[in-house]
Amino acid sequence: MVQQTFTGRKRVRKFFGHIREVAEMPNLIEVQKASYDQFLMVDEPEGGRLDEGLQAVFKSVFPINDFSGASQLEFVRYEFEAPKYDVDECRQRGMTYAAPLKVTLRLIVFDIDEETGAKSVKDIKEQDVYMGDIPLMTMNGTFVVNGTERVIVSQMHRSPGVFFDHDKGKTHSSGKLLFAARVIPYRGSWLDIEFDAKDIVFARIDRRRKIPVTSLMFALGLDGEEILSTFYKKIIYKRAKSGGGSDGWRVPYDPVRFRGYSTLNDLIDADTGKVVLEAGKKLTVRAARQLQEKGLKALRMSDEELVGMYLAEDLVNPKTGEIYAEAGEEITEKSLKALNEEGYKELPLLDIDHVNVGPYIRNTLAADKNMTREDALFDIYRVMRPGEPPTLESAQNMFQSLFFDAERYDLSAVGRVKMNMRLDLDAPDTYRTLRKEDILAVIKTLVDLRDGKGEIDDIDHLGNRRVRSVGELMENQYRVGLLRMERAIKERMSSVDIDTVMPQDLINAKPAAAAVREFFGSSQLSQFMDQTNPLSEITHKRRLSALGPGGLTRERAGFEVRDVHPTHYGRICPIETPEGPNIGLINSLATFARVNKYGFVETPYRKVKDGRVTDEVVYLSAMEEGRYHVAQANLPLDARGRFTEDLVVCRHAGEVLPVTPDKVDFMDVSPKQLVSVAAALIPFLENDDANRALMGSNMQRQAVPLVRAEAPFVGTGMEGVVARDSGAAIAARRSGVIDQIDATRVVIRATEDLDPTKSGVDIYRLMKYQRSNQSTCINQRPLVKVGDIVRKGDIIADGPSTDLGELALGRNVLVAFMPWNGYNFEDSILLSERIVKEDVFTSIHIEEFEVMARDTKLGPEEITRDIPNVSEEALKSLDEAGIVYIGAEVRAGDILVGKITPKGESPMTPEEKLLRAIFGEKASDVRDTSLRVPPGVQGTIVEVRVFNRHGVDKDERALAIEREEIERLAKDRDDEQAILDRNVYGRLADLLENRQGIAGPKGFKKDTKITRAVLDEYPKSQWWLFASPNDKLMAEIEAMRKQYDESKKGLEQRFLDKVEKLQRGDELPPGVMKMVKVFVAVKRKIQPGDKMAGRHGNKGVVSKIVPIEDMPFLEDGTHADIVLNPLGVPSRMNVGQILETHLGWACAGLGRRIGQAVDAYLASAKQETKPLKETLKKVYGDNETIKSLEDHELVELGRNLRRGVPIATPVFDGAKEADIEQMLELAGMDKSGQSTVYDGRTGDPFDRKVTVGYIYMLKLHHLVDDKIHARSIGPYSLVTQQPLGGKAQFGGQRFGEMEVWALEAYGAAYTLQEMLTVKSDDVAGRTKVYEAIVRGDDTFEAGIPESFNVLVKEMRSLGLNVDLHNSKIGDMMPTSEAAE
């Protein structure tokens, strides 16, 4: 059993898992942190940094030479300076949390000898140059950009390397498989090599026009003969000597070559002349092997069997030099006759039998127009740069730069490793460009595939997809910025006087900084962090997206990419993915998975040696795993770790097969390694249908943090891990003793790793009522008392949605599964009034409103209490500066910040001028632009922040806020100082006590003993004056004093820095003089229309809140809190919720029994804990933690368990049906889990027993208050004059085409006309309606809707002139004569 933490002892979970976990789960946000640390490498290690991350970027761009080569700019090293503001300050001020990057550059100027061209160094200058700010990652793996927290999502993309594939027979009508190979570099040109329907091999560069692959080989420097000898074996056919039958050719016999050979004539042994195989038969593999065993060396072939073979070499007349036949030529009867006449005794032929080896490269060579390297290079040049006339030099350079130039082409280490593995090469992974051998090996492998040897690659295999995490994405982005900068530097180096210039003058860091800013601000992968609750944060950081730059697009991604692949096991969660268009493209990392240095996802396994499972854990990537047999984690083992079954089911190369135990190589570490964090939080996941489990994992991320969080009775054991790793709950950084505590901070006096250079005090600031990105409330509260002793890693404060250090997204409520008057029809949820009254599902949401006072061209705007035409009543909650008080209750329409804006002088009539002169009326030239509470919001002001531009006088309110902040900082400083004094003077007293004193403060008698009483006579600051004859002791005291002074100075300095930052003006956007942010806390009780869900995808909307007395109740009078429809279970197949209900019921029953034992203990005079211990032992069995508890800890535990005993049932290894029955029995309940339930309105029992129990319900972030919306008048669209749409724009509801049909069907003509005119876009009519209503009269006439005018304008723009003739309806009626 794991050693429980401080909070873990206060509430112990009963654990149902049977499988011992050997591997520690990696930190859940490691993906983000490790990747970015590797990129930044903030601290330079001994011996300099490795070539990776930022260092590699600088190394790849520098040195930069000018065009003439007379000077060179070299990169020496880089370092980061301290960030200007810390994370919290950045969040408040809307800044980016970043550190300035300082790069040391060296400029070398050369003297070039004009005759010899030799270079000699003339001058070297080194200088530190500022290269922009680089955003830093916070402790929790996020970035603060412009004041908001963002996450950079990792991207899944196709790994660089070579891929072989075919078109599945779709391209050509015959359904023939056309094979293709593609070499994908990390950056650079793509190379495709493909077959066409005629079996000719072509190459394409960057998806351009295709060229024969032989042209590519010519360009690589091969000639025709070399190409043939590379791809085909050569066989020498010798002329057989006459005798033993007719003439023929002697052919060496090779069983592999001749298998499947169909004979035209008899096959004859060349040595004996015997017939080996009669004509017209096929040589089987077995027969071919038997012939070899019988000693067959060679066969005799007749002339006609040579026809159709191809020559391997040029046949040249040695005397005249005349070429009879070229390599690759096909032998015809005519050419064979000619060769026989010339008397050739030996013919070198290509080993092409059209069965095992096809003539594809030979045919391509024959079809290729280009015959020389030059022609081929020109051809490639024309394809890549059409329209430019090629020269040999430019063509050579262009081809060289395509694949062989490290500046433009980079396979990356991954690409090289993958290429070596696929093609069986052994180039070192530092060799990042292509080589001739690589290209030839690719063509060879492709041809082999066409010949039926080998397998094509599966692109969805995780060995062929890799993850680009933050560090790598950032590295690519920064490289782009530096390359933009490089061009500018080169030009500048050539244009300035290089002798007088310093590196600083050559560098403009803007492009690099802009690239970084653009990436964090607007990249598709830089996302606004989902901060609804701690789980949603963690999931967001562990997300893998196939979208984004260089990835897929939603529209083009097919079914295969989105589907679950066998290699996902233990690496990517098969359950958690969004519903909708992104399904399968956005995935989540599995719980135990990690990303290796090459970007492949790895998962841990236990090693199996000789059929025995060891505790050694090995991480394997998908490529490596395919070679082994891997067993499941839940297989039964005996005490020695051997498999108990004779056949073990294993996964091997994507298949599942039974093997004997000695063949097993690895075993899973844990059953939950296959799912993601969110899915691992669902108890009884194994009993839910996958579609519902997907909804369950997605909906847990939308759970709103409640005012009173409560950990689930039925958990999975993952709750503590999530709370700790997400950073929601605060863990102690060092062991120590709690020194001070209040609602906003915890002060710990450290008792371990007391580094003299570090402070001995840890102060943890708690976040109080802060707004999250999703407007939920972040609030932390301490869990410890003064004097508590905590160890490193113990939870000392709970955050949002955490309870005693465990994730608590919802509440345990008493559920009855039964219909109730149709109020739970179609997934509706019926709630008891108790839930509202006791604030069970109440949450706090914090809305932020801001207002800016700008400097306009008519004069500055002003934030003030003095607003024209506003009653004193409306100003009641504003202070003298015009800003709302903290604690004021506000509702829609109330003023939060008073602001007036100057408006332009409108021309005045002489009368007005006279009045203005007499009464001095000046207020009319400003208008009221105050910040008001938007509709639908009401709450309490919890915080106000005022930002002033540098040099603008601060108002009273700003000064008051500043004073408060400085007081808080001073208190922190004083507390830390006090603890420091106590520690130091305590140690000093221990050192001096009982020593001989040879000197001391004024009034101390020399050579007397220093005792505690003597010390207490003097103020502590004078203790340093005591001296003792022991030199070693004095040295120690001196060192201690030095250390103390430094700590004191450091403390004061930190305080002064922070105060200086506070008093300094704020950096505001241009033209803004002052900015005020107001935070309103809104308390949301649950109400009909809110969405709720369980953890099993069982979601619904609250339909009615019923008085407690009307709810169904149990025999003991307990009323149900929530009634769910039983019909929601069978069709959806999420039975997990029923099992959870039963187990929750047992938990509550056991909690009641423990509660009774605690009460008995408190009531008894002797205070005997034995009965309580017995009860706990019955529940928990043999639990180490419970045994180790003191009496008072036992009682506290008992109190905490009163509502219910929390249990953990891990996924795929949880409680079985028998366990649940046993728990119910232990709690003294019916094993069926059903109870007699009475109707709350009549008091009669229902006919059948009802399933009743505790279920964990969440309130989701889809609240009716945010969605409900109504409008009478409001803004209109400019062109169409129709009301805008949507709640955010205060828009109207669209009365669309189908709604019009409905009114037409009713025949409601007047209502319909109103809808389409005066209620929408008839501008004149709208005003008339208003006037009519004001007059109290209800007749109005509809005019021409604006949309008609828009139509007329559109027709005119098409050149159709439409004239409108206005006339009365009567005039338009046909006359009676015309009618007749």
Curated annotation (Swiss-Prot):
Protein name per the record: DNA-directed RNA polymerase subunit beta
One of the GO biological process terms: DNA-templated transcription
The entry's keywords: DNA-directed RNA polymerase, Nucleotidyltransferase, Transcription, Transferase
Annotated organism of origin: Nitrobacter winogradskyi (strain ATCC 25391 / DSM 10237 / CIP 104748 / NCIMB 11846 / Nb-255)
Pfam families reported in the protein's UniProt record: RNA_pol_Rpb2_1, RNA_pol_Rpb2_2, RNA_pol_Rpb2_3, RNA_pol_Rpb2_45, RNA_pol_Rpb2_6, RNA_pol_Rpb2_7
Family: Belongs to the RNA polymerase beta chain family.
The keyword Nucleotidyltransferase is assigned to this record: yes
Subunit-structure text: The RNAP catalytic core consists of 2 alpha, 1 beta, 1 beta' and 1 omega subunit. When a sigma factor is associated with the core the holoenzyme is formed, which can initiate transcription.
Gene from which this protein is expressed: rpoB
